[in-house]
Amino acid sequence: MVAALSSLAAALGAGLHPKTLLLGAVAFLFFAYFLKTRRPKNYPPGPWRLPFLGNLFTLDMEKSHLQLQQFVKKYGNLFCLDLAGKSIVIVTGLPLIKEVLVHMDQNFINRPVPPIRERSFKKNGLIMSSGQLWKEQRRFALMTLRNFGLGKKSLEERIQEEARHLTEAMEKEGGQPFDAHFKINNAVSNIICSITFGERFEYHDGQFQELLKLFDEVMYLEASMLCQLYNIFPWIMKFLPGAHQTLFSNWKKLELFVSRMLENHKKDWNPAETRDFIDAYLKEMSKYPGSATSSFNEENLICSTLDLFLAGTETTSDMRWGLLFMALYPEIQEKVHAEIDSVIGQWQQPSMASRESLPYTNAVIHEVQRMGNILPLNVPREVTVDTTLAGYHLPKGTVVLTNLTALHKDPEEWATPDTFNPEHFLENGQFKKKEAFIPFSIGKRACLGEQLAKSELFIFFTSLMQKFTFKPPSDEKLTLNFRMGITLSPVKHRICAIPRA
C-alpha cells in the first residue's frame, strides 16, 4: 500500500498526462479495495462479487431470503455474501444454528447496528444493543414483565379482555369483506400499551391510530431499497431525499409520542406505586441520580419502549397469516371449529389452561408460524472474537444470519415442507414440539416476549375461531404473497368474518 502511494505521488510530481493520472488513480482504488475486502484465509465460500458493490445488485431485496436458498444448494450450509464491502455469513441447518445461538453463543452474542438504526436509536434499547448495556436492559425488562403478570393470570386476563374487544370489532363488519390488519394490530398493541403506559386505547382513538400507522410504515420502510442503500452509503444518502428520510421522520414522531407519555408519568409518579413499565423504569433511574455511567436513562427508556412495540408487531403478522390460512384451507378451519366446540364450546372464554385440551388448534397455530416465516433470516448477530465455525474462519466483526427459512422448510425435518399441514406438530393426536421449530430464536438472545406472544396468539386465534368462520371475499382472490419489511407479512387483502351460529 505504501509503495502504491509512493508511485502515485511520484507520477504526480513527474507531470504526467491527466488521463494517465486518472487511470493510475482508478487502478490504485481497485488495488486498495482488493486489499480491504479480500476474504481471509479459510473463509466460507460465496458467489462472485462486483468491485465496490459486491453482491448488492445480484440480490432481489423483496425475495432475498428465497434467493439465498439457491446459494445454499451451491455453496453449502455456510457461505458468505458481500454487500458493498460488508461481509455477511449465512448459517443453515439446525446443528450449525445451535452452534451459533447456543453452544458458542458468547462468540456471536452481539448485534451489528446498521447505520439506518444507529441514526435513530444509536446503540440503545433492547433489540440491537450489546454488551453490558444489553444485559442490564434485558434483565430489567424481563423482571418488569414478570412483575406485571408475564406467565400469570393477571396478564392473561388482559389478553382475554382485549380478545373480547377484537371479536366485537369484527362482529361490527357484519360478515362483509374488510382488512383485518389494523383491528388485529389494535388488539396486540393494546396489550403492550397496558404494560408500558398502564392504559389501553379505543380502536377509534385518533392518536392511537396514528401511532399504529407510523409503526406499520417504519416496519416496511426499514427494509426498502433506499434504506438498505443508506446502510451501505450513509455519508451520501443522508443528503438525498427518499424513504430513509421518511423513516427518520416517523421514528422521531414515535419518540415524541413516548416522550409525552413519559412526561405525563413524571407529573404524578409515586415511587411507592408502580403502575406500569415506565413507572418501573423511572424507579430504576432514581437509583442512579446524575450517573454518567448507568444505562438507565430517558434515552434508553424511550428506545426500550419502542422496541417492545416493535416486537409486538411480530404477533400481528402471525395473526394475519393465521386468518389468511384459515380462509384458504376451509377443511382445516372446520377441524379447528369442531375441536373448540367439543372442548370449550362457543361461550367459554379461551384460556391458556385449555391449550393442552386443544392439540389440533395448537398445532395449527404452530404451522401458521412455520409457514408464515415472519423472520426469515432471524435478527443478525456479530462475531465478537475471531472464531472457527464448521472448519471456517470468521473474523471478529463478521455479520452472521441464521437461515430460519431453510430450517422451517427442511425436508429432513418436515414431511411436507411446502404445504400447510398441522400434522407436522401432531403425534397420535397429541401436540408434539419440534426442535427444528424456532420462530422466536433460541439461546440467551431469544425473543424476550416469547411467552407473551404465545399467550396472545393462542387466546386471540382461538377466540376468533370460536366466534367466526373466515372466508375469502367473493370478488377477491386471496394469495400467500408477502410484503417484505422488518417482518414478512401478507400483502394487503380483505377477508370475511362470518359469525358462527
Curated annotation (Swiss-Prot):
What Pfam families does this protein map onto? p450
Q: How does it sit in the membrane?
A: Peripheral membrane protein
Q: Which keywords belong to this entry?
A: Endoplasmic reticulum, Heme, Iron, Membrane, Metal-binding, Microsome, Monooxygenase, Oxidoreductase
- Which cofactor does this sequence's record say it needs? heme
Q: Where mainly found?
A: endoplasmic reticulum
Annotated heme binding lies at: C447
> The organism sits in which domain of life?
Eukaryota
The family this protein is said to belong to? Belongs to the cytochrome P450 family.
The protein's name in its UniProt record:
Cytochrome P450 2J1
Provenance organism? Oryctolagus cuniculus (Rabbit)
What gene does this protein come from? CYP2J1
